[in-house]
Amino acid sequence: MNFVVIIPVRFFSTRFPGKALADIHGKPMIVRVMEKALDSGADKVIVATDSVRIAQVVSSERSSGEVYLTRSDHQSGIERLGEVAANYKFPDNQIIVHLQGDEPLISPIMIRQVANTLDSVKSTTGMATLATSLHSLEEACDNNVVKVVINMNNNALYFSRSMIPWNRGYFDNHPDSRPSRILLRHIGIYSYQVNFLYHYIKWTESPLEKLEQLEQLRVLWHGETIYVSVIDNVFNISVDTPESLRRVNMLFGND
């Protein structure tokens, strides 16, 4: 199964400017993420950025990873993916994995899994993602942790920063309980077929997406489906603050 990984990244992150080049145990974070993608077995790995500085860092690596300088007027990572896909002239059925540039601990197995998932359901949907069970009420109540509700066919019903679904009356009476397996944490990695990607970037921004600040809600708003593969034993930390960077460096140091 053939798939391509694209890592959209910009230098001026709102919460943590310059984090793409933050040092993680001797290497810039974007390089660490690219290495994970290369280990996934992808046919091609492309870093998509509007930053010359980031492009130079990636280009200096002696690896098979590529870099593509995008326009600077994109409003989102998905728009960068669209520009890259069009420039490379990928076929309509090509599977693209959208990997965030702040995921240096992501497992290469997960990267391949989200591609395999879409390959298995591509006749019914153009987009797939991953989720895992929530492990604590603290995690379930954290608005930085995105939750997802799925139906019996594993299609997403809704994504939210709030705890969904809410078990009426139970959590109030059992505050120390573990969430049930039906409560899922979304893992922010996606796979798309190229023709679906082109539709996605043409859709207008939805009210729900603006409210939650979750771009994937645009797909549900426009009546399309997102297939969600539920996986176990996931450990991952996104680097979005200096504190999370320190935690990741400690984990790399313990390898």
Q: At which residue positions do the language-model features occur?
A:
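N-terminal glycine-rich phosphate-binding loop and ensuing alpha1 helix
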Residues: N2-T49
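Hydrophobic/aromatic residues located in beta-strands of well-ordered beta-sheets
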Residues: V5, V45-V47, I96, M127-A128, ...
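Short, acidic/turn-prone active-site loops that include or flank metal/cofactor-
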Residues: F11, R71-G77, N233-F235
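A conserved hydrophobic position in a structured secondary element of the catalytic/binding core
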Residues: T49-D50, I106, Y192, D240
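Short phosphate-binding loop-to-helix
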Residues: V52-N116
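Conserved core of the sugar-phosphate nucleotidyltransferase
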Residues: S107-T204
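Conserved alpha/beta core of the MobA/IspD/sugar-nucleotide pyrophosphorylase nucleotidyltransferase superfamily
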Residues: N173-D255
